[in-house]
């Protein structure tokens, strides 16, 4: 499991790892409730990432529609749209698996809560015995490879290290002598824990989508902007002046594009 740099994401990952380790000792209602809390946090995080990504996609469309920019921006925008489509497909695929496991464990109550959160048969049957986990693993790998093939070759090596969506093969153990990935993640795992893991995979997909689309946006940022307006600007050398006092100022002519409304931030004190 990859570890993100953001504090909130790091905390979610660490909590998931701790809870998974505790499952090996005891499947208690307290641990299952903790998984439920982590799942809610991951879902909230996923929604925030979607909002961020949508702003990037909107920015691509706006930039492509600017005068004289279409031919230069469109290749980046097309790549971004492909990333979005592939990400949405994987997100839906993982969501479908959640519902399959929940249905296999007994379904939901009227309030939409999972009926049998501690059931360990559904995940084992569907994702291990019926090889659903192998298919899921293949989907994640295919998405990862698509993202790596989207970025420029000179940054691909760094992205191979940084992309959150990745497959980490387990080591051999007494319970998993073949080091089978599906067994490591899904064998005898409670339904609530599996649902949380699938949400974690969705989080990895969303974060990886954001990283690659941001890279495309950075590359598109090198595009030349056509200036269509000019304005005289006076920049005084002092922030205040007394009545009758002479003021020195730097006079310049600024060129800009009326269609561009940049956002400027500062990290200074």
Briefly describe each language-model feature range:
Residues 23-37:
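Membrane-interface motif at the C-terminal end of an N-terminal transmembrane signal
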Residues 29-30, 95, 210, 256:
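Residue-level marker of positions within ordered structural domains that often coincide
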Residues 35-202, 209-212:
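Juxtamembrane extramembrane loops of integral membrane proteins
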Residues 161-269:
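Conserved mid-sequence domains
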């Amino acid at each position: 499991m990859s570890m993100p740099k953001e504090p909130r994401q790091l905390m979610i990952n660490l909590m998931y790892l701790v809870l998974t380790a505790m499952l090996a000792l005891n499947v208690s209602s307290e641990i299952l409730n903790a998984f439920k809390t982590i799942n809610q946090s991951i879902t909230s995080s996923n929604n925030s990432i979607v909002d961020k990504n949508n702003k990037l996609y909107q920015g691509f469309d706006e930039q492509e529609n600017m005068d004289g920019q279409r031919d230069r921006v469109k290749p980046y925008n097309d790549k971004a749209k492909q990333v979005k489509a592939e990400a949405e497909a994987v997100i839906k695929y993982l969501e479908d698996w959640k519902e399959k496991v929940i249905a296999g464990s007994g379904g939901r109550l009227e309030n939409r809560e999972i009926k049998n959160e501690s059931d360990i048969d559904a995940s084992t049957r569907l994702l291990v015995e019926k090889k659903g986990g192998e298919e899921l693993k293949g989907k994640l790998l295919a998405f990862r490879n698509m993202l790596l093939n989207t970025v420029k070759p000179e940054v691909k090596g760094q992205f191979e290290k940084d992309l959150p969506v990745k497959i980490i093969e387990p080591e051999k153990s007494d319970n998993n002598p073949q080091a089978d990935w599906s067994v490591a993640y899904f064998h005898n795992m409670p339904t609530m824990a599996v649902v949380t893991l699938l949400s974690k995979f969705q989080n990895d997909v969303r974060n990886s989508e954001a990283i690659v689309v941001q890279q495309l946006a950075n590359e598109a940022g090198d595009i030349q902007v056509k200036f269509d307006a000019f304005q005289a600007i006076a920049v005084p050398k002092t922030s205040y002046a007394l009545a009758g006092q002479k003021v020195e100022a730097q006079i310049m002519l600024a060129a800009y594009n009326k269609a561009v409304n940049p956002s400027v931030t500062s990290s200074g004190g």
